[in-house]
């Protein structure tokens, strides 16, 4: 009964059973390639695969899932090596609490629960990404607009590109990216299909998963206000969208006694603060001007590439709610200080900027499409594995 209901729901959004399976198949195939490469690197560096998939922020996520916010052991520290009673509140609760709930199943460890959550969320994200690709490829500027057959292919290509971004390895780690991208993707599907309750609820969820949820909230609220003539459901989306984000900030306020408690924790522990892009500009100029570290140069080039993709998306007239979301993601990351080497990971939710690339690849013969995605999958697997085993600092 549940499967029938799910299929019925997907058909409401123009998603056939066959298309959904293809999206999931493309996604899982590319992610399996990445995991195989990571396994090889783990062996070369005498490290366990489990340790790699749960390192850095993953340790925090699993720690919160196991101990809750109040019971985190003292060895869990912020970016400066400091532990306080409030440090854990830097991490939004959506992902670790979901893992904690799944781990209630007898026999499941928090790590196993996290992997299950990520696989399910990744598959849901893949279907949403595919649908976004189909919709947007048929709504961009007329000179590059896809035919119905090309639109379906463009959606699948977009899924492949999403699964093969340089740091897509985090989709399989105990990180928030898989869950966040699923919620962000379905929120955008809701906006594009004018399904306002779906959009509002997914935005609410995204706001509970990570601070980048403000990008989803902004896109949903603005689109719903513009479409206010759709009636009560549009207004419901406006009300629902920010509740998760604001609710968690209120929880941290209650714990710390400060309305800006969460921001203070971030600034003190990870130097994350709005600076108008000064730190990003400094990183780009210093790295590309005189830097020699491969990982830093690759990250700098990735930042520039994302900005170029944004300009390309604007030129292609990708639907404006999608551009609002992408712009908000970029602004929230590039206009703030913090750990520069985490930018490649944090920019993963800007997958919608790959739409112009997907549309053009979709016009090529099938063999060329498969070859392109195969190369992308291999590069993604290598880059992600290298960042986890060779690069020595947090991502």
Q: Regions from the language model: what does each represent?
A:
Residues 89, 93, 97, 105-127, ...:
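Loop-to-helix entry region of an early transmembrane alpha helix in multi-pass inner-membrane enzymes
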Residues 163, 170, 184-189, 197-225, ...:
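Membrane-interface alpha helices of multi-pass inner-membrane proteins
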Residues 142-152, 187-198, 361:
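Membrane-interface transmembrane helices that cradle and orient dolichyl/undecaprenyl
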Residues 101, 113-140, 305-312:
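Transmembrane-helix motifs of polytopic, lipid-linked glycan transferases
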Residues 56-107, 276-280:
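Short hydrophobic/aromatic helix or loop-helix immediately within or flanking a transmembrane segment
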Residues 30-48, 53, 217-326:
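Membrane-lumen/periplasm interface segments of specific transmembrane helices
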Residues 117-120, 157-186, 205-216, 343-349:
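Multi-pass, polyprenyl lipid-linked donor-dependent membrane glycosyltransferases
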Residues 109-112, 130-164, 182, 324:
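Transmembrane-helix signature of polytopic, membrane-embedded enzymes
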């Amino acid at each position: 009964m549940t499967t029938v209901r799910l299929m019925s729901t997907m058909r409401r959004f123009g998603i056939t059973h066959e298309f959904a399976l293809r999206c999931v198949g493309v996604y899982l195939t590319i992610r399996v390639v990445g995991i195989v490469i990571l396994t090889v690197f783990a062996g070369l560096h005498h490290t366990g695969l489990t340790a790699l998939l749960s390192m850095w922020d993953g340790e925090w996520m699993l720690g919160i899932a196991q101990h809750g916010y109040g019971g985190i052991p003292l060895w869990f520290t912020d970016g400066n090596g400091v532990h306080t009673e409030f440090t854990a509140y830097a991490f939004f609760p959506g992902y670790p609490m979901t893992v904690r709930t799944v781990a209630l199943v007898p026999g499941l460890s928090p790590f196993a629960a996290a992997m299950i959550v990520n696989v399910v969320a990744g598959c849901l994200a893949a279907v949403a990404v595919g649908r976004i690709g189909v919709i947007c490829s048929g709504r961009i500027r007329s000179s590059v607009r896809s035919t119905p057959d090309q639109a379906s292919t463009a959606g699948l290509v977009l899924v492949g590109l999403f699964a093969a971004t340089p740091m897509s390895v985090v989709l399989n780690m105990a990180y928030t990216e898989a869950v966040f991208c699923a919620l962000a993707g379905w929120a955008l599907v809701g906006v594009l299909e004018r399904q306002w309750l779906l959009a509002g609820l997914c935005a609410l969820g995204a706001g509970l998963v990570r601070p980048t949820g403000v990008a989803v909230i902004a896109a949903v609220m603005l689109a719903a206000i513009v479409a206010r003539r759709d009636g009560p459901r549009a207004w419901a989306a406006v009300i629902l969208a920010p509740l998760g984000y604001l609710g968690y900030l209120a929880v941290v306020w209650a714990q710390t006694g400060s309305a800006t408690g969460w921001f203070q924790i971030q600034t003190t522990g990870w130097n994350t603060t709005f600076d108008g892009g000064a730190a990003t500009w400094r990183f780009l100029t210093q790295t590309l001007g005189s830097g020699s570290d491969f990982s830093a140069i690759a990250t700098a080039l990735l930042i520039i590439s994302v900005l170029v993709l944004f300009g390309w998306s604007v030129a292609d007239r990708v639907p404006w709610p999608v551009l609002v979301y992408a712009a908000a993601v970029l602004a929230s990351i590039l206009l703030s200080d913090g750990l520069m080497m985490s930018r490649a990971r944090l920019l993963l939710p800007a997958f919608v900027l790959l739409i112009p690339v997907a549309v053009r690849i979709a016009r090529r013969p099938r063999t060329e499409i498969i070859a392109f995605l195969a190369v992308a999958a291999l590069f993604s697997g290598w880059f992600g594995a290298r960042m986890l085993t060779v690069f020595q600092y947090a991502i």
